[in-house]
Amino acid sequence: MSCRDCTRKGGCVYTTFWLVRFLPVVLVSLATGWGIYAYTYELCILSIDNWPQRIIYLFIFYALLILFYTSYLRTVYTKAWKPPQKYCIEGASKATYESVKDDERQLQLFLSDIARERDLTLLVRGFDHGIRFCDKCCCIKPDRSHHCSMCEQCVLKFDHHCPWVNNCVNFGNYKYFILFLAYGFIFCIWIAATTLPSFIDFWRHEYDMNKKQYDSIDSVIQRNLKHLHTVLSNGRFPLVFLLFLSCMFSLSLSFLFFYHLYLTAKNRTTVESFRAPMIDGKYAKDAFNHGIRANYREIFGSHPLYWFLPVPSSIGDGCKFVMNDMTAMSAAAGNQVFVEMGNVPNGQSHAHPPIAQHHINLYSEQSSSASEKEIKSVDDEITERSQVSTATTASPSHDSVTA
């Protein structure tokens, strides 16, 4: 087997790399499994004697566990959404692409023709103000999509590639990702809050017992070491470690959770927060911001029943997005955007009169006919001038020949 075969899909190097990438998912699952044992047995069975309290603790624990781990699995196993087939260059179009790909101007003309023929909605432009194209996937990039080097494909509404879920966070699983962060944060807070009182009670009890044995001031260090040894040797180490893990994970999850709440409120992705999308030759960081309520509805859906459940309810198809009114008017003022007024899809609400769709087509019917008329008038003028110039030049020559 050659080195090239090893690096291909199914090869030994590729398989090893895939297993390493999946390691964080295994670690999260192992930590969750160990937490189930520690909370159920070490805390609820060994440390809590009150049956009603034990039942309440276990009921809330397992309810949060189901919501947390289901959201996590949906985030992990929901495949990243690819651009639809109509954005891809295939067949005869592929041959044309191969012939013009080295000439940027011809390539943009070719992509513009494809976008017009297939009625593609393209609001976001590249830094060169041209249509964004992925030469690896050989497809026109839909708005807000990007190529993921880890997944080796273009991904719709790409947010980031998260190693802890071994998947791209994108349009297809962004709701699950936020629910995973939310329930993970609440889950860890609940574990820490319910473990801490039992741990403190046990610590104080053992400390008082050791204090009677070591009363002299000179034996303070010895008393504390004995106390720590008692705590660990009496089976309390799982409780200590559970408290430590829950505090650590709740702290780390809180940063991610509240950051993505902010991004959702602004209708931005992580990529867009660092590099604003370019629309009409300008960076528009709030191009898709329609207000907090509408932005959250776009992610979680219109039905409150589905907001807190890891089930699909997001609005849209991941390709077409609605610009806010200010961005649309700014773009229209530059005569580069053609705006079609209508109803906001899927029940989205806005503070201002809604704009349902904004099409940027370099070769729309209106612009094409206007360009053709302008070109025809210029051609007629050039023809007229050339005829006059020819007649003027030819007259003296004719007179001299006659003479």
Curated annotation (Swiss-Prot):
It is found in: Membrane. One of its GO terms (molecular function) is protein-cysteine S-palmitoyltransferase activity. It comes from the Eukaryota. InterPro entries: Palmitoyltrfase_DHHC, PFA4/ZDH16/20/ERF2-like. Its main location: membrane. Coiled coil: none annotated. The keyword Transmembrane helix applies. Residues 365-403 are annotated as: Disordered. One of its GO terms (cellular component) is Golgi apparatus. GO terms for biological process: protein targeting to membrane; synaptic vesicle maturation. The keyword Acyltransferase applies. Residues 132-182 form the DHHC domain. It is a multi-pass membrane protein. Disulfide bonds: none annotated. Residues 385-403 have a biased composition (Polar residues). This is Zinc finger DHHC domain-containing protein 4.
